[in-house]
């Protein structure tokens, strides 16, 4: 797991760094303005639908059913199942994309109530341009899940590189001709590129394709039944961002942009560590669950959580204690002024408090899906979203943008602990003692590294000192025990 995770993390890291550079360019050319608020609002809506199918519910529901069908009915029938699901995905995504174009103005009116009428028109136009991004990214995400299942992790992980390059190109060159619309065209082109990157390896893997949909297949019906609670869960998690936008639309201009830029920074470790390790681990947990191998599931999950903590806890300390330094380093160029730095750094600090929880939810949710339990993650996500809405309402008056970020962190923490403890109670008795002890050791190492770097003024040197001091404390244990440093029996 560790070797595959590291290879995929390197690719994902490249993609996420390009994503930060993309954000830097948008900040440089457009600053934190009403136009960027309109762009990020429209993008969040199209991206929200992408999260439902593109990299979430559908793939996680499909993979366990695919393994079961292959075991019961053989290779050929399982291939036909893949084609049926992909064809249904195409039809559904196409319909949703068309509906987004038709009803774009109504969607914008509903989501960002606080925008002026002129700004709503801009956001509606941008959403129309980006609508078909959902079609391409849904197909890309589904094909990527299938490639992951066959052990091809690098290709799906690389798709976001092309997406980021598309928006970078659009910001640098198309901006001259289309202004803020250039970013929307970049999103659409990026979606097409992501689809093409996985489409050809997918065809090479399966060697054929069929446009047939077998609606009589009991596994198609079973997929629909299991998908509903999964969709509710993913919907609830993603609605957090939409809820934040709704409240932020009533704040000063640039607040939505600040939340978006801050979330992109804290989502760097979530994407690089949480999503990567979860995707690599999911097929093996699914197989262990199918064989009722509880010890194997315990070992895989605890070692993965420890490995995630090793990567995430130091990231949490950096983003919390050095938030302003990090934002200055990434965004403080061109039209991105000192006030924009200040509010973005404040958002980052409060988002980062929940970093461990965001990452943990990614992994533990996969453990539920491997067990065929799609309902509990959905219920816990709904609980978290209700808490997030209530906390947003309570915090926004006194804490403005900071309150929105803090509410997201708290609700994510509730979601994570519900997932973890109910999983331990109902499925596998995880070695929580090992997990807690390792977490304490990593936290102590992070405190020492923070103390060593805190008073250094140069931000790059500060981050280097932090990294060196932290890694030196773990160099010998990792050298001696290798993977076993994260789970020793």
Report each predicted region and the residues it spans.
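Membrane-embedded alpha-helical bundles of multi-pass transporters/translocases
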Residues: 1-489
């Amino acid at each position: 797991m560790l070797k595959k995770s590291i290879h995929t993390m390197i690719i994902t890291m490249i993609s996420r760094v390009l994503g930060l550079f993309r954000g830097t360019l948008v900040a440089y050319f457009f600053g934190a303005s009403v136009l960027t608020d309109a762009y990020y609002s429209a993008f969040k809506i199209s991206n929200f639908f992408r999260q439902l199918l593109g990299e979430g519910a559908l793939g996680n529901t499909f993979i366990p059913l695919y393994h079961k069908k292959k075991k019961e009915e053989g290779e050929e029938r399982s291939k036909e199942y893949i084609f049926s699901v992909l064809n249904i995905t195409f039809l559904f995504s196409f319909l949703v994309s068309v509906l987004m174009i038709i009803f774009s103005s109504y969607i914008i009116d509903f989501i960002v109530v606080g925008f002026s009428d002129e700004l709503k028109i801009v956001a509606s136009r941008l959403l129309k341009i980006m609508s078909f991004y959902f079609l391409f990214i849904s197909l890309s995400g589904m094909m990527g899940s299938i490639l992951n299942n066959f052990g091809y992790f690098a290709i799906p992980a690389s798709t976001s590189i092309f997406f980021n390059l598309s928006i970078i190109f659009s910001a640098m060159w198309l901006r001259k001709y289309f202004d803020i619309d250039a970013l929307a065209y970049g999103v659409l082109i990026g979606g097409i590129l992501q689809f093409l990157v996985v489409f050809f390896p997918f065809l090479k893997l399966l060697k054929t394709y069929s446009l047939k949909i077998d609606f009589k297949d009991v596994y198609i019906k079973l997929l629909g039944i299991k998908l509903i609670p999964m969709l509710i869960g993913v919907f609830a998690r993603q609605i957090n961002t939409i809820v934040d936008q709704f409240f932020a639309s009533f704040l000063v201009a640039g607040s939505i942009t600040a939340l978006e830029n801050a979330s992109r920074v804290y989502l760097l470790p979530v994407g690089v560590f949480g999503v990567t390790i979860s995707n690599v681990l999911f097929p093996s947990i699914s197989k262990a669950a199918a064989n009722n191998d509880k010890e194997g599931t315990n070992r895989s999950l605890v070692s993965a959580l420890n490995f995630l903590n090793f990567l995430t806890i130091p990231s949490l300390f950096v983003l919390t204690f050095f938030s302003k330094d990090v934002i200055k380093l990434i965004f403080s160029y061109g039209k991105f002024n000192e006030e924009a730095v200040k509010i973005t750094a404040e958002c980052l600090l409060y988002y980062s408090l929940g970093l461990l929880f965001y990452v943990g939810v990614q992994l533990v949710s996969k453990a539920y899906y491997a067990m065929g339990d799609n309902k509990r993650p959905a219920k816990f996500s709904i609980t978290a979203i209700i808490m997030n809405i209530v906390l947003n309402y309570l915090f926004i008056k006194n804490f403005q943008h900071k309150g929105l970020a803090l509410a997201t962190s708290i609700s994510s923490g509730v979601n994570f602990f519900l997932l973890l403890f109910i999983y331990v109670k109902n499925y596998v008795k995880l070695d929580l003692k090992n997990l807690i002890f390792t977490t304490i050791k990593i936290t102590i190492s992070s405190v020492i590294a923070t103390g060593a770097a805190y008073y250094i003024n140069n931000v790059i040197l500060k981050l280097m000192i932090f990294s060196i001091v932290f890694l030196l404390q773990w160099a010998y244990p990792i050298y001696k025990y290798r993977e076993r440093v994260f789970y020793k029996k």
